[in-house]
Swiss-Prot record:
Its EC number is 2.7.11.1. Residues 946-1239 form the Protein kinase domain. Keywords: ATP-binding, Kinase, Leucine-rich repeat, Nucleotide-binding, Repeat, Serine/threonine-protein kinase, Transferase. This is Probable serine/threonine-protein kinase DDB_G0278509. It comes from the Eukaryota. The lineage of its organism: Eukaryota, Amoebozoa, Evosea, Eumycetozoa, Dictyostelia. Residues 181-216, 860-873 have a biased composition (Low complexity).
Amino acid sequence: MSKVIGYIDYGDPDGNEEPSKQNGEYIDYSNENGYNAYHSVNGGYDKDNNNHHHHNQEEDYDYDNNTHVNYLTTKHSQFQLSRGRLYQGHQSSHIIYPHQSYKLSNSGESMNRSINQSKEEDHLENSLHDDEYLYGYEDHHDDQASSISQESSQGLDETDFDNIDKYFESNQHLLLQTLQNNNNNNSNSNSNSNSNSNNNNNNNNNNNNNNNNNNNTKNNITDENQLEIHLNDLSIDSDNSNNKINKQYVNSDNSNNNNSNNSNNNNIGSNINSNCNIENEKNSNNTDDNNNNNNIENVNKINIEDNNNNNNNNNNNNNNNNNNNNNNNNNNNNNNNKIEVISNKPIQLFSDYDPPILTTSTSTSQSKIKTQQPFLFFSSNYLNSSSTELDLSEQELNEFPIFDEKEIVQGYKIIDLSFNNIKSIPLDAFTNISNLEQLIMFNNNLSDVPSSIEFLKHLTILDLSHNNLHEICRELGNLSFLRELYLSNNSLKKFPTTGNLYNLKKLILDNNQITTIPIECVEPLIQLQTLDLSFNKIGTITSSTTTTTTTTTTNNNNNNGGGGSIYQKMKNLKQLNLSHNELQEIPSSLRHLSKLHSLSIDYNQISVLPDKVVASLSRLAKLTISNNKIKQLPFAINNLSSLIELNASNNVIELLPDSICYLSNLKKLNLNNNNLKELPSNIGFLTKLVDLQLYNNQISSLPISFLKCRSIREIGTDGNPLPSYYHLGIKAIRYHIKNPDCDLDDLNSISPTIDSSTIEQQQQPIQLFGGGNYIDSSNNNGNESFCNSGELSPLTDSLECIEMPPPMQISENLRKPLNVNSPSYPFQKLDPIPQSLYSSSNPRSHTESDIQKLKNNDETITTTNSSISTTSSPPSLLFGVSINGNGIISTTTTTTTTTTTTNGKTLSRQSSFQQIPQQFNLSTSTTNITKLPRIKYTWEIDFDEIQFFNLIGQGGFSKVYHGVWRSKDVAIKQIELQNNKSLDDFRREVGILSKLKPHENLLAYYGACKHANYCYIITEYLPRGSLHDLLHREQLMKLDFKQKVSFAICVALGCYHLSTYEPPIYHTDLKTKNLLVTNALKIKIADFGLASFAKKSLTTIINNNNNTNNTATSSTTTSSANGANSISNNNNNGTTSVDQSRLAYAFYAAPEILNSKHFSEKSDVFSFGTILWELVTNKIPFDGMDPYEVKELLKSGKRLEIPENCNEVLKNIIQDCWNQQSEDRPTFLSIYHRLENLMKSITKKRRF
């Protein structure tokens, strides 16, 4: 019987228009000049010459069996089909699909519709409803053929399928005989221009055009024999007595003899009740005796179609074409029976039993058969096109499909079995697919590869990645045509035997357990261009292993030297990646790689770049040496004349050689996180430099030659002792370099912000430049009584260091107003104000007398007040002091004239200023000042606008409610103010939240407020809850592997975004309860109660409740020398430790936090590893264990057990995140890239 060989995926024809739907019909616009523009696997239709052609005829023909190979033309469709199954029969293959029809080609010939010659005769009447019906064509017959009665019918049942099966079984020898006979036919057919014969659409309407027939002759395919069975609307009655043919007709030859069978009703099997037409044509060159045979000797075409096309012209021209038929039938084809089984009911096939095979008994006819082109044609499927690919991916197959008949599958060049569950391959699986060129089987569960793979002599691409292979058979090395071999993400411990793989150009072996590379395995790879050995366990690459390699990747191999002299033989190497290998030094043999274009040796332990190596790499365009221990770049770096990009970040470089300035093609230079104190004086020679990154160094000034770097567009200077406004960009930097005195009169468009919280930390006087500065005190923690008590505090010494540098221009100062939240500032210790402050161009400046009053600290002066208006402020109290805003407009204006004599010339200068509308007392006494009006912060929300709903979460110090604010669903976090520390924690959390920029993986923050003895933080509301709930509540949805990887990517992206702030933000409380799930199944990071800025005075909290997502008390942190932050709780002994009562966070915390040491981004990375473990296992970390015990386990290096069946990529990431030393852990950016590559391998199929 037949065998199921898999599910089918198919699509649109390449190069043809998709069918369009008009008025309920599907129109085929590819049919031109009577031909359907389908292209076969190796052939197609040539519109210009009206002929068919074969591309690679040698590959189409089987010279041993004298037959043409078979092709299944399936492509992807825009229709969503389901449960379709491909069956393997005896001589013919056929497809049973519930929603769609297919075509099978036994010849590889172009699949033209064999019924109609003209486009106007070829139409489709039945529409495709809801993607559930088969559709096709019916022949248009003339009056002699009689009309076909259309009767309502019913679909096939199981008995009918058995009858169809029996028919093919009983006639398989006839099908084979026909195929062989047709292959021996060599004919030239001429068609009369007035003829409407439809002999398989191979005869041209033009008498002079024989191209089509000539091509058929070349391919040994005649164009006559045809048996058509229309089954799309097949109706079968279970009552055997009623299963009869309702209509027959016979067209005879020139003798005009009508067969008596026209009037008879013939049974087809015992189960068919349909309208059938049997057309028999008589050939004058054959005797009538040949027609007394009940067997059909030549059956070349089976057409399962709809009943919508009428074969109006087929019978009119029988006599006209008998001569043609005689000329074409040189192989004694005796009978042609054209059987049409037509009804109206669509076939609905959802069965799981053996395929339907038509059973029929055909009456003998006293006529001869005309031949048609030999191929099996299963309904007119617009979406089929010539394809060499069989796509059986994502079908949940557990076994490798068996292809029994070589003729059926020999034409396939590509078989895709990816994303199934195939565990093994039978030894004889490749016997009948020896012509296969590409076998794609990634993402299965294969444990081995059979030795019979050597039968695939023509294989060029083999993808067995993401399986469970432990070893590769030696026979694979006999695939001499193999060009690409993918074996990544397996469990290979040995390098595969390469044998005769002389044409191999790409070998991918990443994410395995390979420890050594034997020379004999690499020597045959003379054409190798790409070798990926990343994420293996190679200790030392054996010398002299490879030659003529273009790309080599050996990431994470712990090579400890990188293979020594092997690079000496890799003279054609263009790209070399040795990153993540813990290399102690660069092999000197790298100097032989004179053709190298890209070299990556980042994330190692290299301290020196050898001059000899660098000097020899003159063609190098990209050099990445970041995250090493390099102290100095070699002087020979100027030999890298082709260098475009240099990344030397995260080293300990203290000095750049002057020779670096001669890299004339350099465009990107990254020197972040080093110990540089200055740049070379000739840095301006880098005229093509576009991007310069200098973050976190010790550079105090830029050389004047920097102005020559006119191509530069991006520059990063944060974390250096440079003027604070350098972050404004290249314009401000260039201006400052040109004008050391920094007269910013021309920089009115720049509006730097002075954070008043930093004023107390200044060790040197700050300079207040004019031109639109304003003071931002939103983060200020000092002088809070000004904002809260309603009274001015006594003047302090906190601002005694403020200086106003001469000269200072403060013209045009309406750009930014004074922030009303700023505290009061004392002026009694201000140095004398320079005369240059008197500005003639400043209409809002003070008069000389007013300034003198300020200098002498008189009790009453007049000054501008840009913070308030005259109508909103109390008439007799000070609301704020502005020294640069001058935003209020006085009702009166005073004009003064100043006369100056210079070089004997008298110059007159006129100045205008606005007078102060009110006076205030600047003495230290506050007795006359009443309570100030309440100041509202920019982040503050009106409590009355909040509407509370139900409680959705509760912790030790806070509760979370669902509510509404300004018509938005929001989450409201309520924090009880138990003491001043609680208020400090609240202000710090709000300060961080207000700095966050919108990001898809961070919970949106709306604002906060204080009411009574509570503080409230308003954020986005996500009704799905936390990832913890999604993982551990049984009633919720079950997450598949792909979704879990997607969650991990979201968390990594969100954390990476936090690390990009300057200074970086550390969450320090990453856990699944603080990861909220959106309706689109994305993750957003929430709860910044423990979050901290790096390199600032920070507070952090160790939560004492494992069930809370909220804020607790905190411990103060201070900056450490290396930029990480140390948790400091001083106990009675003066030592630093973590509050031992708050250890719930220990379940996710990094060891350095538990050891009371510094924390950094890498601390969050450790927590991310635990989250990833929780995603993989669906278990709660350290569930039921005592926090103290967990703490000791983590500090001692013990970790949670990773399941054996865990994906290798995720396993490696988890292990890397759990490294005991924080510097050994990856960054979130590298984690994201690794996860993204894993996601691509899951969701995106490789197309070659």
